[in-house]
Amino acid sequence: ELPTIPLPFLMFIMIGFVLVIDLLGLAVTGLFLPFMELFTFNITNATALEWIFAVGFMVFTQPVGEEMIFRGVLFPLMRARLGAVGGLVANAAAYALFHLVLYTSQIGAVDPRALIWYGLIAPFLDGLILACVRAYTQSTSAAIVAHVVFGLFAIVKLFVITG
């Protein structure tokens, strides 16, 4: 039986991972950009309702929806079919391709390096980390909590970028 991870400790670990991925993105692209989901969000002109929707999307809707699909349904199927490592990699690749298709138009015009990093590599790393959380804890709920941390970080980063 695997040891359980207290959720506050898991959240703390996820802050470290998201910081490392974000700093790698800055090193690779030379650009400090908001997360793709918030790329077109205008912080200065946003209404209270737009803020509620943005925060709700980043810390509830997206983490729950994506984790239920990618880690709750697809990951067990991929792991059963491809083995432990193959399932992790295939799940992360599917997650990355989903994000690439969904957000390419928003970030592609900025810089080709940004498109490759923020559109494919960073989502792959995020997906790999989230799949590892799911595999280690055997809990989709833990993956949702980890994803919530990514969403909270995205909101904080948006504030940092826009001052």
Report the location of each language-model feature:
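Interfacial transmembrane-helix boundary/kink motif in multi-pass membrane proteins
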Residues: 1-24, 43, 80-83
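Transmembrane helix-loop-helix hairpins at the membrane interface
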Residues: 19-26, 35-39, 48-163
